[in-house]
Protein backbone atom coordinates (compact mmCIF):
# COMPACT_ATOMS: atom_id res chain seq x y z
CA UNK A 1 0.00 0.00 0.00
CA UNK A 2 -3.14 3.96 2.06
CA UNK A 3 -3.35 7.65 1.43
CA UNK A 4 -0.53 9.21 -0.42
CA UNK A 5 1.41 12.22 -1.63
CA UNK A 6 4.45 13.21 -3.56
CA UNK A 7 7.81 13.21 -5.38
CA UNK A 8 11.30 11.77 -6.29
CA UNK A 9 13.69 8.86 -5.61
CA UNK A 10 16.16 6.55 -7.26
CA UNK A 11 14.72 3.50 -8.93
CA UNK A 12 14.68 0.39 -6.76
CA UNK A 13 18.05 -1.27 -7.08
CA UNK A 14 17.82 -5.01 -7.50
CA UNK A 15 20.58 -7.54 -7.56
CA UNK A 16 19.76 -11.03 -8.69
CA UNK A 17 21.18 -13.77 -6.51
CA UNK A 18 21.23 -16.85 -8.68
CA UNK A 19 21.08 -20.16 -6.88
CA UNK A 20 21.80 -22.13 -10.01
CA UNK A 21 25.15 -22.32 -11.76
CA UNK A 22 26.26 -23.46 -15.19
CA UNK A 23 23.20 -22.43 -17.20
CA UNK A 24 23.30 -21.40 -20.81
CA UNK A 25 20.89 -18.87 -22.11
CA UNK A 26 18.18 -17.97 -23.43
CA UNK A 27 16.03 -15.73 -25.38
CA UNK A 28 12.91 -13.99 -24.20
CA UNK A 29 10.39 -15.52 -26.50
CA UNK A 30 6.64 -15.57 -26.08
CA UNK A 31 5.70 -18.28 -23.58
CA UNK A 32 2.01 -18.62 -24.30
CA UNK A 33 2.45 -22.27 -25.25
CA UNK A 34 3.42 -23.04 -21.66
CA UNK A 35 0.42 -21.27 -20.21
CA UNK A 36 0.27 -18.10 -18.11
CA UNK A 37 3.00 -17.10 -15.71
CA UNK A 38 1.67 -17.81 -12.21
CA UNK A 39 2.54 -15.23 -9.56
CA UNK A 40 1.80 -15.76 -5.87
CA UNK A 41 1.39 -13.05 -3.22
CA UNK A 42 -0.23 -12.44 0.16
CA UNK A 43 -1.22 -8.94 -0.98
CA UNK A 44 -4.79 -9.18 -2.27
CA UNK A 45 -6.72 -6.15 -3.53
CA UNK A 46 -9.41 -4.64 -1.32
CA UNK A 47 -11.36 -3.28 -4.32
CA UNK A 48 -11.30 -3.11 -8.11
CA UNK A 49 -12.30 0.57 -8.21
CA UNK A 50 -9.37 3.02 -8.33
CA UNK A 51 -11.49 5.75 -6.71
CA UNK A 52 -11.84 3.62 -3.57
CA UNK A 53 -8.28 2.49 -2.98
CA UNK A 54 -5.12 3.96 -1.53
CA UNK A 55 -3.59 0.62 -0.65
CA UNK A 56 -1.94 -2.40 -2.22
CA UNK A 57 -4.84 -2.83 -4.63
CA UNK A 58 -2.59 -0.58 -6.71
CA UNK A 59 -0.42 -3.60 -7.51
CA UNK A 60 -3.24 -5.01 -9.62
CA UNK A 61 -4.35 -1.60 -10.92
CA UNK A 62 -0.91 -0.90 -12.39
CA UNK A 63 -1.36 -3.84 -14.74
CA UNK A 64 -5.02 -3.53 -15.76
CA UNK A 65 -5.60 0.23 -15.78
CA UNK A 66 -3.62 3.00 -17.41
CA UNK A 67 -2.41 6.35 -16.11
CA UNK A 68 -1.30 9.41 -18.01
CA UNK A 69 2.25 8.86 -16.78
CA UNK A 70 4.10 5.77 -15.60
CA UNK A 71 7.61 4.42 -14.97
CA UNK A 72 9.41 2.56 -17.76
CA UNK A 73 12.23 0.30 -16.61
CA UNK A 74 15.08 2.41 -15.27
CA UNK A 75 13.08 5.63 -15.00
CA UNK A 76 13.38 7.73 -11.85
CA UNK A 77 10.71 10.20 -12.97
CA UNK A 78 7.33 9.55 -14.61
CA UNK A 79 7.18 9.22 -18.39
CA UNK A 80 4.14 9.40 -20.73
CA UNK A 81 1.92 6.32 -20.98
CA UNK A 82 -1.66 7.15 -21.94
CA UNK A 83 -0.25 10.59 -22.61
CA UNK A 84 1.91 11.38 -25.59
CA UNK A 85 3.50 14.28 -23.70
CA UNK A 86 3.01 16.25 -20.46
CA UNK A 87 4.56 19.41 -19.07
CA UNK A 88 4.07 22.44 -16.84
CA UNK A 89 3.11 25.33 -19.09
CA UNK A 90 3.85 28.13 -16.60
CA UNK A 91 6.85 29.16 -14.53
CA UNK A 92 5.07 28.79 -11.19
CA UNK A 93 4.24 25.07 -11.55
CA UNK A 94 0.47 25.59 -11.32
CA UNK A 95 -0.71 24.62 -14.83
CA UNK A 96 0.06 21.11 -16.08
CA UNK A 97 -0.98 20.01 -19.56
CA UNK A 98 -1.03 16.56 -21.17
CA UNK A 99 -1.67 15.55 -24.77
CA UNK A 100 -3.10 12.04 -25.12
CA UNK A 101 -1.92 9.41 -27.57
CA UNK A 102 -4.10 9.09 -30.64
CA UNK A 103 -6.64 6.29 -30.90
CA UNK A 104 -6.83 5.22 -27.27
CA UNK A 105 -9.66 2.89 -26.27
CA UNK A 106 -10.70 0.93 -23.22
CA UNK A 107 -10.58 -2.86 -23.32
CA UNK A 108 -14.33 -2.88 -24.13
CA UNK A 109 -13.74 -0.77 -27.23
CA UNK A 110 -15.11 2.48 -25.79
CA UNK A 111 -13.21 5.64 -26.61
CA UNK A 112 -10.60 6.93 -24.14
CA UNK A 113 -10.33 10.66 -24.65
CA UNK A 114 -9.71 13.84 -22.68
CA UNK A 115 -13.26 13.74 -21.35
CA UNK A 116 -12.64 10.27 -19.84
CA UNK A 117 -9.48 11.50 -18.12
CA UNK A 118 -11.27 14.53 -16.68
CA UNK A 119 -14.18 12.33 -15.58
CA UNK A 120 -11.85 9.85 -13.85
CA UNK A 121 -10.03 12.52 -11.83
CA UNK A 122 -13.20 14.47 -10.99
CA UNK A 123 -14.89 11.20 -9.97
CA UNK A 124 -12.21 10.48 -7.36
CA UNK A 125 -12.90 13.79 -5.66
CA UNK A 126 -16.68 13.58 -6.05
CA UNK A 127 -16.99 10.12 -4.51
CA UNK A 128 -14.34 11.05 -1.92
CA UNK A 129 -14.00 7.62 -0.33
CA UNK A 130 -12.59 7.63 3.19
CA UNK A 131 -9.10 6.19 2.81
CA UNK A 132 -9.29 6.64 -0.97
CA UNK A 133 -6.92 8.55 -3.26
CA UNK A 134 -8.75 11.91 -3.13
CA UNK A 135 -6.18 13.04 -0.58
CA UNK A 136 -3.56 12.95 -3.31
CA UNK A 137 -5.33 15.76 -5.11
CA UNK A 138 -5.26 18.48 -2.48
CA UNK A 139 -3.30 20.78 -4.79
CA UNK A 140 -5.72 20.33 -7.72
CA UNK A 141 -8.22 23.11 -8.39
CA UNK A 142 -9.84 21.92 -11.64
CA UNK A 143 -9.42 19.68 -14.69
CA UNK A 144 -10.14 20.95 -18.19
CA UNK A 145 -10.69 18.82 -21.30
CA UNK A 146 -9.67 20.70 -24.45
CA UNK A 147 -10.89 18.84 -27.50
CA UNK A 148 -10.41 15.07 -27.61
CA UNK A 149 -6.75 14.85 -26.70
CA UNK A 150 -5.67 17.66 -24.38
CA UNK A 151 -6.15 17.66 -20.59
CA UNK A 152 -5.16 20.69 -18.51
CA UNK A 153 -4.78 20.54 -14.73
CA UNK A 154 -5.10 23.84 -12.88
CA UNK A 155 -3.49 23.72 -9.43
CA UNK A 156 -4.41 25.89 -6.46
CA UNK A 157 -0.78 26.19 -5.35
CA UNK A 158 2.66 25.42 -6.75
CA UNK A 159 3.29 21.68 -6.73
CA UNK A 160 6.34 20.41 -8.57
CA UNK A 161 5.40 16.88 -7.52
CA UNK A 162 2.03 16.77 -9.30
CA UNK A 163 3.35 14.62 -12.21
CA UNK A 164 4.24 11.94 -9.68
CA UNK A 165 0.67 11.98 -8.41
CA UNK A 166 -0.66 11.43 -11.92
CA UNK A 167 1.65 8.42 -12.24
CA UNK A 168 0.15 6.63 -9.22
CA UNK A 169 -2.35 3.83 -9.89
CA UNK A 170 -4.82 5.84 -7.80
CA UNK A 171 -5.17 8.12 -10.84
CA UNK A 172 -6.14 5.24 -13.16
CA UNK A 173 -8.37 6.21 -16.08
CA UNK A 174 -11.81 4.56 -16.09
CA UNK A 175 -14.63 4.36 -18.64
CA UNK A 176 -17.31 7.00 -17.90
CA UNK A 177 -19.94 4.69 -19.37
CA UNK A 178 -19.05 1.92 -16.92
CA UNK A 179 -18.13 3.78 -13.71
CA UNK A 180 -20.72 5.92 -11.95
CA UNK A 181 -19.54 9.13 -10.33
CA UNK A 182 -22.04 8.64 -7.52
CA UNK A 183 -20.79 5.40 -5.99
CA UNK A 184 -17.94 2.90 -5.91
CA UNK A 185 -18.21 0.27 -8.64
CA UNK A 186 -19.31 -3.15 -7.42
CA UNK A 187 -18.70 -6.54 -8.96
CA UNK A 188 -15.66 -8.41 -10.20
CA UNK A 189 -15.16 -6.91 -13.67
CA UNK A 190 -13.34 -3.81 -14.88
CA UNK A 191 -13.08 -1.61 -17.95
CA UNK A 192 -9.49 -0.45 -18.22
CA UNK A 193 -6.89 0.35 -20.86
CA UNK A 194 -3.75 -1.13 -19.31
CA UNK A 195 -1.41 -3.79 -20.69
CA UNK A 196 -3.74 -6.54 -19.48
CA UNK A 197 -7.45 -7.17 -19.39
CA UNK A 198 -8.91 -8.76 -16.25
CA UNK A 199 -10.42 -11.92 -17.70
CA UNK A 200 -11.52 -13.42 -14.40
CA UNK A 201 -11.37 -12.26 -10.80
CA UNK A 202 -12.13 -14.21 -7.65
CA UNK A 203 -11.71 -11.91 -4.63
CA UNK A 204 -9.02 -13.14 -2.27
CA UNK A 205 -8.21 -16.08 -4.55
CA UNK A 206 -6.93 -15.08 -7.98
CA UNK A 207 -6.85 -12.56 -10.81
CA UNK A 208 -6.50 -13.88 -14.36
CA UNK A 209 -4.83 -11.36 -16.68
CA UNK A 210 -4.68 -11.69 -20.44
CA UNK A 211 -3.05 -9.41 -22.97
CA UNK A 212 -5.11 -6.33 -23.78
CA UNK A 213 -4.75 -6.15 -27.55
CA UNK A 214 -6.14 -2.60 -27.54
CA UNK A 215 -3.42 -1.26 -25.23
CA UNK A 216 -1.39 1.70 -26.48
CA UNK A 217 1.40 2.78 -24.16
CA UNK A 218 5.08 2.34 -23.38
CA UNK A 219 4.84 -1.17 -21.87
CA UNK A 220 6.39 -3.82 -24.12
CA UNK A 221 4.60 -6.94 -22.90
CA UNK A 222 6.89 -9.96 -22.77
CA UNK A 223 4.15 -12.47 -21.99
CA UNK A 224 0.56 -12.98 -23.08
CA UNK A 225 -1.01 -13.92 -19.76
CA UNK A 226 -0.37 -13.77 -16.01
CA UNK A 227 -2.42 -15.33 -13.23
CA UNK A 228 -2.00 -13.81 -9.78
CA UNK A 229 -2.91 -16.12 -6.92
CA UNK A 230 -3.63 -14.66 -3.49
CA UNK A 231 -2.59 -16.45 -0.31
CA UNK A 232 -3.58 -15.85 3.29
CA UNK A 233 -0.37 -17.17 4.79
CA UNK A 234 3.29 -17.36 3.86
CA UNK A 235 3.61 -21.07 4.50
CA UNK A 236 1.16 -22.00 1.76
CA UNK A 237 2.79 -19.47 -0.59
CA UNK A 238 6.24 -20.99 -0.15
CA UNK A 239 4.91 -24.55 -0.35
CA UNK A 240 3.24 -23.91 -3.71
CA UNK A 241 6.44 -22.38 -5.07
CA UNK A 242 8.41 -25.45 -3.99
CA UNK A 243 5.75 -27.70 -5.49
CA UNK A 244 6.05 -25.82 -8.82
CA UNK A 245 2.46 -24.59 -8.63
CA UNK A 246 3.83 -21.04 -8.86
CA UNK A 247 6.42 -19.47 -11.13
CA UNK A 248 7.23 -16.52 -8.90
CA UNK A 249 6.33 -15.04 -5.50
CA UNK A 250 5.88 -11.35 -4.86
CA UNK A 251 5.28 -10.12 -1.29
CA UNK A 252 4.55 -12.40 1.62
CA UNK A 253 7.45 -14.85 1.82
CA UNK A 254 8.33 -15.49 5.45
CA UNK A 255 11.88 -14.75 6.53
CA UNK A 256 12.62 -18.45 7.10
CA UNK A 257 11.58 -19.24 3.53
CA UNK A 258 13.70 -16.42 2.08
CA UNK A 259 16.72 -17.70 3.96
CA UNK A 260 15.95 -21.28 2.96
CA UNK A 261 15.74 -20.36 -0.72
CA UNK A 262 18.93 -18.30 -0.50
CA UNK A 263 20.75 -21.23 1.07
CA UNK A 264 19.92 -23.23 -2.01
CA UNK A 265 17.57 -25.83 -0.61
CA UNK A 266 15.80 -25.60 -3.98
CA UNK A 267 18.24 -26.24 -6.80
CA UNK A 268 16.04 -24.74 -9.48
CA UNK A 269 15.19 -21.46 -7.75
CA UNK A 270 16.39 -17.87 -8.14
CA UNK A 271 16.05 -15.20 -5.47
CA UNK A 272 16.11 -11.54 -6.39
CA UNK A 273 16.91 -9.23 -3.49
CA UNK A 274 16.19 -5.53 -3.82
CA UNK A 275 16.26 -2.34 -1.82
CA UNK A 276 12.85 -1.18 -0.71
CA UNK A 277 11.28 1.89 0.85
CA UNK A 278 8.39 -0.06 2.31
CA UNK A 279 7.91 0.46 6.03
CA UNK A 280 5.77 -0.84 8.88
CA UNK A 281 4.57 1.24 11.81
CA UNK A 282 2.06 1.47 14.66
CA UNK A 283 -0.84 3.92 14.62
CA UNK A 284 -2.42 5.30 17.81
CA UNK A 285 -6.07 6.36 17.83
CA UNK A 286 -6.30 9.75 19.59
CA UNK A 287 -9.95 9.13 20.50
CA UNK A 288 -9.12 6.06 22.58
CA UNK A 289 -8.98 6.84 26.32
CA UNK A 290 -5.52 5.28 26.68
CA UNK A 291 -3.92 5.50 23.22
CA UNK A 292 -4.99 9.14 23.13
CA UNK A 293 -2.65 10.00 26.01
CA UNK A 294 0.75 11.31 24.92
CA UNK A 295 2.48 9.69 27.91
CA UNK A 296 1.14 6.26 26.93
CA UNK A 297 2.30 6.66 23.34
CA UNK A 298 5.75 7.79 24.45
CA UNK A 299 6.02 4.87 26.86
CA UNK A 300 5.25 2.42 24.04
CA UNK A 301 7.76 4.15 21.75
CA UNK A 302 10.34 3.93 24.53
CA UNK A 303 9.84 0.19 25.06
CA UNK A 304 9.74 -1.08 21.48
CA UNK A 305 12.90 -3.04 20.66
CA UNK A 306 13.12 -2.78 16.89
CA UNK A 307 16.37 -4.72 16.66
CA UNK A 308 14.78 -7.70 18.41
CA UNK A 309 11.83 -7.60 16.00
CA UNK A 310 14.12 -7.38 12.97
CA UNK A 311 16.43 -10.18 14.15
CA UNK A 312 14.19 -12.58 16.09
CA UNK A 313 11.01 -12.33 14.00
CA UNK A 314 12.25 -11.35 10.54
CA UNK A 315 15.72 -12.96 10.60
CA UNK A 316 17.31 -9.68 9.48
CA UNK A 317 15.31 -9.52 6.28
CA UNK A 318 14.16 -6.08 7.50
CA UNK A 319 16.02 -3.18 9.10
CA UNK A 320 15.08 -1.30 12.31
CA UNK A 321 13.54 2.08 11.47
CA UNK A 322 13.66 5.21 13.67
CA UNK A 323 11.82 7.64 11.42
CA UNK A 324 8.72 7.66 9.24
CA UNK A 325 11.02 8.61 6.35
CA UNK A 326 13.05 5.51 5.44
CA UNK A 327 16.80 5.36 5.09
CA UNK A 328 18.02 6.20 1.61
CA UNK A 329 15.59 9.05 0.99
CA UNK A 330 16.41 12.75 1.15
CA UNK A 331 15.94 14.12 4.64
CA UNK A 332 15.91 10.80 6.52
CA UNK A 333 16.92 11.15 10.16
CA UNK A 334 16.63 9.12 13.36
CA UNK A 335 14.16 11.32 15.23
CA UNK A 336 12.66 8.48 17.27
CA UNK A 337 16.04 7.18 18.39
CA UNK A 338 17.09 10.75 19.24
CA UNK A 339 13.97 11.11 21.40
CA UNK A 340 13.86 7.68 23.01
CA UNK A 341 17.22 5.97 22.54
CA UNK A 342 17.52 2.31 23.48
CA UNK A 343 14.53 0.51 25.03
CA UNK A 344 14.21 1.36 28.72
CA UNK A 345 11.49 0.37 31.20
CA UNK A 346 12.70 3.01 33.65
CA UNK A 347 12.32 5.84 31.11
CA UNK A 348 8.92 4.52 30.04
CA UNK A 349 7.76 4.44 33.65
CA UNK A 350 8.79 8.06 34.11
CA UNK A 351 6.67 9.10 31.11
CA UNK A 352 3.65 7.48 32.76
CA UNK A 353 4.20 8.58 36.37
CA UNK A 354 4.93 12.17 35.30
CA UNK A 355 1.46 12.12 33.72
CA UNK A 356 -0.10 10.69 36.89
CA UNK A 357 -0.52 7.17 35.47
CA UNK A 358 0.46 4.57 38.09
CA UNK A 359 -1.67 1.58 37.07
CA UNK A 360 -0.89 -0.94 34.34
CA UNK A 361 -2.11 0.49 31.06
CA UNK A 362 -4.56 -1.78 29.17
CA UNK A 363 -4.08 -1.57 25.41
CA UNK A 364 -5.60 -3.52 22.53
CA UNK A 365 -3.28 -3.98 19.54
CA UNK A 366 -4.71 -4.93 16.16
CA UNK A 367 -3.04 -6.39 13.08
CA UNK A 368 -4.12 -7.81 9.72
CA UNK A 369 -3.88 -11.57 9.40
CA UNK A 370 -3.46 -11.85 5.63
CA UNK A 371 -1.83 -8.74 4.16
CA UNK A 372 1.84 -8.66 5.09
CA UNK A 373 2.64 -12.33 5.62
CA UNK A 374 2.35 -14.75 8.50
CA UNK A 375 5.25 -13.14 10.41
CA UNK A 376 2.92 -10.26 11.33
CA UNK A 377 1.26 -12.34 14.05
CA UNK A 378 4.68 -13.26 15.46
CA UNK A 379 5.73 -9.63 15.33
CA UNK A 380 2.76 -8.49 17.38
CA UNK A 381 3.30 -11.31 19.86
CA UNK A 382 6.85 -10.00 20.27
CA UNK A 383 5.57 -6.43 20.77
CA UNK A 384 3.12 -7.73 23.38
CA UNK A 385 5.97 -9.57 25.13
CA UNK A 386 8.18 -6.46 25.14
CA UNK A 387 5.48 -4.17 26.52
CA UNK A 388 4.28 -6.57 29.20
CA UNK A 389 7.84 -7.43 30.27
CA UNK A 390 8.16 -3.82 31.43
CA UNK A 391 5.42 -4.35 34.00
CA UNK A 392 3.68 -1.23 32.67
CA UNK A 393 1.16 -2.65 30.18
CA UNK A 394 -1.49 -5.32 29.80
CA UNK A 395 -1.82 -6.09 26.10
CA UNK A 396 -4.55 -7.91 24.18
CA UNK A 397 -4.01 -8.85 20.56
CA UNK A 398 -6.61 -9.02 17.80
CA UNK A 399 -6.28 -9.95 14.13
CA UNK A 400 -8.60 -9.54 11.15
CA UNK A 401 -8.43 -10.25 7.41
CA UNK A 402 -7.51 -7.16 5.39
CA UNK A 403 -10.92 -6.22 3.99
CA UNK A 404 -12.61 -6.09 7.40
CA UNK A 405 -9.43 -4.77 9.01
CA UNK A 406 -9.53 -1.67 6.80
CA UNK A 407 -13.18 -1.07 7.67
CA UNK A 408 -12.30 -1.28 11.35
CA UNK A 409 -9.54 1.30 11.41
CA UNK A 410 -11.44 3.66 9.11
CA UNK A 411 -14.29 3.56 11.66
CA UNK A 412 -11.87 4.25 14.50
CA UNK A 413 -12.44 0.89 16.18
CA UNK A 414 -8.82 0.13 17.10
CA UNK A 415 -6.85 1.78 19.94
CA UNK A 416 -3.52 0.80 18.34
CA UNK A 417 -3.05 -0.90 14.99
CA UNK A 418 -0.29 -1.91 12.59
CA UNK A 419 0.05 -0.64 9.05
CA UNK A 420 2.48 -1.16 6.22
CA UNK A 421 3.27 1.54 3.69
CA UNK A 422 4.46 1.12 0.14
CA UNK A 423 5.32 4.52 -1.33
CA UNK A 424 3.37 6.11 -4.12
CA UNK A 425 6.71 7.51 -5.21
CA UNK A 426 10.13 7.68 -3.55
CA UNK A 427 10.22 11.08 -1.87
CA UNK A 428 10.10 12.11 1.81
CA UNK A 429 6.82 13.92 1.10
CA UNK A 430 5.19 10.53 0.53
CA UNK A 431 6.13 9.37 4.03
CA UNK A 432 4.80 12.44 5.81
CA UNK A 433 1.89 14.01 3.90
CA UNK A 434 -0.24 10.83 3.64
CA UNK A 435 -0.48 10.49 7.42
CA UNK A 436 -1.38 14.01 8.51
CA UNK A 437 -4.32 16.33 7.97
CA UNK A 438 -8.07 15.89 8.05
CA UNK A 439 -8.10 13.31 5.26
CA UNK A 440 -5.27 10.82 5.34
CA UNK A 441 -4.32 7.24 4.62
CA UNK A 442 -5.26 6.09 8.10
CA UNK A 443 -8.88 7.20 8.16
CA UNK A 444 -8.02 9.00 11.42
CA UNK A 445 -7.71 12.81 11.31
CA UNK A 446 -4.29 14.03 12.45
CA UNK A 447 -4.17 17.83 12.67
CA UNK A 448 -0.57 18.94 12.21
CA UNK A 449 -0.78 22.54 10.93
CA UNK A 450 2.96 23.18 11.13
CA UNK A 451 3.44 20.33 8.65
CA UNK A 452 0.38 20.75 6.43
CA UNK A 453 0.27 24.54 6.28
CA UNK A 454 3.96 25.42 6.29
CA UNK A 455 6.53 22.68 5.80
CA UNK A 456 4.84 20.72 2.98
CA UNK A 457 3.91 23.80 0.90
CA UNK A 458 7.46 25.12 1.26
CA UNK A 459 8.95 21.82 0.14
CA UNK A 460 6.65 21.51 -2.88
CA UNK A 461 7.93 24.74 -4.37
CA UNK A 462 11.33 23.12 -4.68
CA UNK A 463 11.93 21.16 -7.88
CA UNK A 464 15.38 20.05 -6.69
CA UNK A 465 14.43 17.59 -3.97
CA UNK A 466 17.92 17.66 -2.48
CA UNK A 467 16.95 21.07 -1.09
CA UNK A 468 14.10 19.90 1.16
CA UNK A 469 16.18 18.36 3.97
CA UNK A 470 15.39 21.13 6.44
CA UNK A 471 11.61 20.96 5.98
CA UNK A 472 11.44 17.19 6.35
CA UNK A 473 13.83 17.18 9.27
CA UNK A 474 11.40 19.47 11.10
CA UNK A 475 8.42 17.36 10.06
CA UNK A 476 10.02 14.18 11.39
CA UNK A 477 10.75 15.95 14.67
CA UNK A 478 7.07 16.89 15.03
CA UNK A 479 5.96 13.31 14.31
CA UNK A 480 8.35 11.93 16.92
CA UNK A 481 7.22 14.46 19.51
CA UNK A 482 3.56 13.51 18.94
CA UNK A 483 4.26 9.74 18.80
CA UNK A 484 0.94 9.23 17.01
CA UNK A 485 2.89 7.03 14.60
CA UNK A 486 5.70 4.73 15.74
CA UNK A 487 7.95 3.35 12.95
CA UNK A 488 9.08 -0.25 13.37
CA UNK A 489 11.08 -1.41 10.37
CA UNK A 490 12.05 -0.86 6.74
CA UNK A 491 11.81 -3.84 4.44
CA UNK A 492 13.99 -5.43 1.84
CA UNK A 493 12.31 -6.77 -1.28
CA UNK A 494 12.57 -10.45 -2.18
CA UNK A 495 11.26 -12.17 -5.29
CA UNK A 496 11.66 -15.93 -5.54
CA UNK A 497 11.14 -17.53 -8.94
CA UNK A 498 11.56 -20.74 -10.88
CA UNK A 499 14.82 -20.77 -12.82
CA UNK A 500 13.03 -20.61 -16.19
CA UNK A 501 11.44 -17.23 -15.34
CA UNK A 502 13.27 -14.06 -16.22
CA UNK A 503 12.55 -10.34 -15.95
CA UNK A 504 12.18 -10.21 -12.16
CA UNK A 505 15.11 -7.79 -11.89
CA UNK A 506 13.32 -5.26 -14.11
CA UNK A 507 9.78 -5.85 -12.86
CA UNK A 508 9.65 -3.49 -9.88
CA UNK A 509 8.82 0.16 -10.39
CA UNK A 510 10.15 2.90 -8.03
CA UNK A 511 7.32 2.17 -5.59
CA UNK A 512 8.07 -1.59 -5.60
CA UNK A 513 4.91 -2.33 -7.60
CA UNK A 514 5.34 -5.26 -9.96
CA UNK A 515 5.06 -4.62 -13.68
CA UNK A 516 3.88 -8.07 -14.74
CA UNK A 517 4.60 -7.35 -18.39
CA UNK A 518 8.35 -7.58 -17.75
CA UNK A 519 8.18 -11.30 -16.82
CA UNK A 520 8.86 -14.01 -19.39
CA UNK A 521 9.91 -17.63 -19.73
CA UNK A 522 13.37 -18.46 -20.99
CA UNK A 523 12.99 -20.37 -24.21
CA UNK A 524 16.19 -22.36 -23.92
CA UNK A 525 17.94 -23.63 -20.83
Locate each region found by the language model:
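N-terminal lobe/hinge region of extracytoplasmic solute-binding protein
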Residues: 40-91, 122, 191-192
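Ligand-site clamp/hinge motif
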Residues: 213-259
Amino acid sequence: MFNRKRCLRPVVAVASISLVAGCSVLSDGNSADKGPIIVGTTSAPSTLDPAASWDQSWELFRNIYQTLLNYPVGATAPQPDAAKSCRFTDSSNTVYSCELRAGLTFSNGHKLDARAVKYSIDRIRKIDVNGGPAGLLDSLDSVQAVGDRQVVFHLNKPDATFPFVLATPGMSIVDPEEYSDKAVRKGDTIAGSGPYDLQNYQPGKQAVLVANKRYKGFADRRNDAVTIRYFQDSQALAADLRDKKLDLTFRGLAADDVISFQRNDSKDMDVTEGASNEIEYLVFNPKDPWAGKLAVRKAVAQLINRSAIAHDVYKDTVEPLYSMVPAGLTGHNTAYFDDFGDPSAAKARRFLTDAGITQKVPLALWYTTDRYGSATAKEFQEIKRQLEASGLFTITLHGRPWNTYVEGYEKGEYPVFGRGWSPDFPDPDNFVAPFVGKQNALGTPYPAPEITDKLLPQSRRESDRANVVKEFGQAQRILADDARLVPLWQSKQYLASRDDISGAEQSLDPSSIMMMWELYRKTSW
